[in-house]
């Protein structure tokens, strides 16, 4: 994750309630970096479907077991099951001021279901009902980067085999080609950091995400920011867009 000085980032006025935030963007645009910065700035959690699924499987919950069974059989996991997992997570008290959605909603059906829930009484659970802030409408921001730049970010990525330090042969190369600055061991490329794998991931992203984007665009709850600027500039652009969208939905 890229380090940044959050003190230099202009953010919405004190008391700003972000509510539910959906960050969209293709693989490599920096969603993870930006999500972490916004979490630190506003003290809100990230709601990751990957984390929720792993936790349900670990705890052996009914939905966790159902998910495992479907995956083992090679059956597509239906929206209803994913929605139930998210519903359980959104019943926790830490979502009161808002949260960042990661990997959800991924389909139009999931987006429509979430909107229906947030427009209703919230998600009653063991910890009580979701607060009014947590039930604000979802607002979505897409971080956009040109395809050729994303390709450079992904295919140029190399990692120290021991230190795990991350490089990019185009933008942040090691001092000696192919060797880790830390210990001189060979750098490695992840098997999925190839042009062929990236092209397939981009195809899947476009097919899944396009309907979700159009859903929120149609509701007037969607904006785009340029992801090719500095980390700080992108964060400031996202914060400004979120404040504008939140005022629009107030």
What kind of region is each of these model predictions?
Residues 1-250:
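Glycine-rich phosphate-binding loop of ATP-dependent small-molecule kinases
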């Amino acid at each position: 994750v890229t380090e940044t000085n959050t003190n230099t980032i202009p953010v919405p006025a004190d008391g700003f309630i972000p509510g539910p935030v959906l960050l969209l963007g293709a693989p490599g645009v920096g969603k993870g970096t930006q999500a972490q910065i916004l979490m630190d700035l506003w003290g809100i959690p990230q709601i990751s479907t990957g984390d929720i699924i792993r936790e349900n499987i670990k705890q052996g919950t009914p939905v966790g077991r159902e998910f495992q069974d479907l995956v083992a059989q090679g059956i597509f996991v239906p929206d209803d099951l994913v929605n139930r997992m998210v519903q359980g997570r959104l019943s926790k008290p830490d979502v009161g001021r808002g949260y960042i959605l990661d990997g959800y909603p991924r389909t139009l059906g999931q987006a429509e279901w979430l909107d229906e829930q947030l427009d209703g009484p919230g998600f009653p659970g063991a910890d009580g009902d979701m607060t009014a802030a947590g039930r604000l409408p979802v607002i979505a921001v897409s971080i956009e980067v040109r395809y050729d730049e994303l390709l450079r970010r992904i295919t140029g990525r190399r990692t120290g085999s021991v230190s795990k330090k991350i490089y990019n042969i185009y933008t942040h190369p090691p001092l000696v080609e192919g060797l880790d600055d830390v210990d001189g061991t060979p750098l490695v490329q992840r098997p999925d950091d190839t042009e062929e794998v990236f092209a397939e991931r981009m195809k899947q992203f476009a097919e899944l995400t396009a309907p979700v984007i159009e859903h929120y665009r149609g509701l007037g709850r969607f904006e785009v920011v340029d992801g090719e600027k500095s980390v700080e500039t992108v964060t400031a652009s996202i914060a400004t867009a979120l404040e504008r969208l939140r005022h629009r939905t107030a």
